[in-house]
Swiss-Prot record:
Keyword Cytoplasm recorded: yes
Protein name: Ribosome maturation factor RimP
A Pfam family: DUF150_C
Organism superkingdom: Bacteria
Source organism per UniProt: Myxococcus xanthus (strain DK1622)
Subcellular location: Cytoplasm
Example of a GO cellular component annotation carried by this entry: cytosol
Keywords: Cytoplasm, Ribosome biogenesis
Length: 161
C-alpha cells in the first residue's frame, strides 16, 4: 500500500472510530491527520468545545478516551504518537456546520480540480454564503465563486493580522 493510500485509509477509519467517542466527551472532532514527520508517524486530532475554548484538560480527556479504542482496533500498521490539540486560529473547515460558524470571515479553500471562471484551484476570500451543496467565496479582484462541498480538498479559516 502506498503511503498516500495508507494515510487516507487510516484517517477514514480513525475518523469513523473516534468521532463518536469524542462526541461522548461533549466535544467535537473537527479534523484529524495521519502523517509521517521527522520523529515518526503521528495521529493528530483537532478538537473543539461548542461555545468554549479547548484547554489542556480537554486534550488530556480526549487522549485518554480514544487511546483504548485505538489499541483494541489496532488498524494502524506503524508505531505512532497520538497528539490532541485545539484547531487553532487557522482551524480546518470540513463540515457544513464548520463553514456556517465562520460565515463572513476570511477563508482559504483548495479544490481537487479547477473551479469557476476563470478556472482556479486556490481561493482566499470572504465566505459569503453556505448553501445546501456548497459555499460561495468572494475573492478580492476576481469576483464570487461557488464551490461545491464535494470539490473541496482542504479549507481553513484564514487568520487576519
Amino acid at each position: 500500500m502506498s503511503e498516500k493510500n495508507l494515510k487516507q485509509t487510516v484517517e477514514e477509519r480513525a475518523l469513523a472510530l473516534l468521532e463518536p467517542i469524542v462526541a461522548g466527551e461533549g466535544l467535537e472532532l473537527v479534523d484529524l491527520e495521519f502523517l509521517r514527520e521527522r520523529e515518526g508517524w503521528v495521529l493528530r486530532l483537532f478538537i473543539d468545545k461548542p461555545g468554549g475554548r479547548v484547554g489542556l484538560d480537554e486534550c488530556t480527556q480526549v487522549s485518554r478516551a480514544v487511546d483504548p479504542s485505538l489499541d483494541v482496533e489496532d488498524f494502524i500498521p506503524h508505531e505512532y504518537n497520538l497528539e490532541v490539540s485545539s484547531p487553532g486560529v487557522d482551524r480546518p473547515l470540513r463540515k457544513p456546520t464548520h463553514f456556517e460558524r465562520v460565515k463572513g470571515q476570511q477563508v482559504k479553500v483548495k479544490t481537487f480540480g479547477p473551479v469557476g471562471e476563470p478556472p482556479r484551484k486556490n481561493f482566499t476570500g470572504t465566505l459569503t454564503e453556505v448553501a445546501g451543496d456548497g459555499i460561495s467565496v468572494e475573492v478580492e479582484g476576481a469576483g464570487t465563486f461557488h464551490i461545491l462541498f464535494k470539490d473541496i480538498a482542504k479549507a481553513n479559516l484564514e487568520f487576519q493580522f
